[in-house]
Amino acid sequence: MQAEIIFTGTELLVGEVLNSHAQYLGRRLTEMGIEVIQHTTVGDYWGRMGLVLLQALERADLIFITGGLGPTIDDLTKETVAEVLELDMKLDEASLEAIREHFAKRGMEMPDNNTKQAYFPEGARVLPNTRGTAPGAIVEVDKKAIIILPGPPWEMETMFDNSVVSYLNSLPHRGTLCTSKTFRLTGIGESTVQELIDDLCGMGNPEISFLVNPGVVEVRVTGQGATLEQATGLVQNLSEQVRKRLFQYIFAEDDEKIEQVVGQMLIDAGLTIAVAESCTGGLIEARLSDIPGASRYLVGGVVAYTKQVKERILGVPADTLAQFGAVSRQTAIAMAEGVRRELGSSIGLAVTGVAGPTSSEGKPVGLVYIALSSPTGVCYREYRFPGERKAIRSGTVNAALKMAKHFLQGK
């Protein structure tokens, strides 16, 4: 079964808005064994939209259309579908009442133009929108289906999960099913990653692919099978081999948030953490504090950008700074011990490094030291992060959280 996705909205064409729908729908449909054969982005003009829809109907079994379901005159998706299929637009009373209730819950009266959102091509299956005022729809024609979804990502994704998945699962002959496992790595470049697992690549099914973001290399293992169990088995077998070879660089898997994992591990262990940061400027503490309830384990942090702050606030000995420099193993350890002592936490985590764009004290750009202090002792690691300033800082944050995770795991 093949699908085509049409993204509507002039804001997408001119680059004002990032098209996150492409990634989400492409991934979800592929996982369900539906082959996505084409993406098309079209502006808010019904003539072009109609032409694109006609072409898609010739190629694909399923046509997904996102956006253009609002109450304004340039929201033309449903009207275009009706025009192309020569269908009348009909008012859905249940949708109209749901839209009225949406406004009433906010102490507002529904504007008259929102009535437009309750009209659908005749015979359409209405998809309720639990997070907005724009219901979606499924229109079936000649053994094909046009699936109309709202533009805002949070509305579209919720509607897909709540209504579209069950519809797609009811369709026969979806083809092979697909699943994947993703590993997120830091402190290593893409080429080195490939060298370490080169003999595992090129199998075809399952296959390994790579994606590089600032400070992160993603390794994805993807498998296909006649059943989800078969595909999952293929992925699990290869993933275990990948995990063993790359363990020291893996900081997260799939959609896992390492800061959330570390936080829960601290809670389970009854421990607290404090952070001393130089080159990351508070990014580690920000990641940890982004999780609700972080006050249960995060004591606080110190941004020690200068030698003076490292010495006065964290108690880094002046002779350590003079002999080894601000970017050194010795300074990182002293920072970790100092922040644990001064803030009274169970664990002290510290980073110091050269984020660039120029070297410092003769130390190269990308050189970073990370240290962790606990009642049982200290551990540290030296990194040479590739890339620009943003990538180095991002990699440092992930590596520091990985060190905390491995410590809490006892590894």
UniProtKB/Swiss-Prot annotation:
Q: Name one Pfam family in it.
A: CinA
Q: Where are the transmembrane segments?
A: none
InterPro entries in alphabetical order: CinA, CinA-like_C, CinA_C, CinA_KH, Competence-induced_CinA, MoaB/Mog-like_dom_sf, MoaB/Mog_dom
Instruction: Show the Gene3D superfamilies listed in the entry.
Output: 3.30.70.2860, CinA-like (3.90.950.20), MoaB/Mog-like domain (3.40.980.10)
Q: Can you tell me which family this protein belongs to?
A: Belongs to the CinA family.
NCBIfam families registered for this protein in UniProt: cinA_nterm, PncC_domain, PRK00549.1
Protein's recorded name: Putative competence-damage inducible protein
The species this protein was found in:
Desulforamulus reducens (strain ATCC BAA-1160 / DSM 100696 / MI-1)
**Gene it is expressed from:** cinA
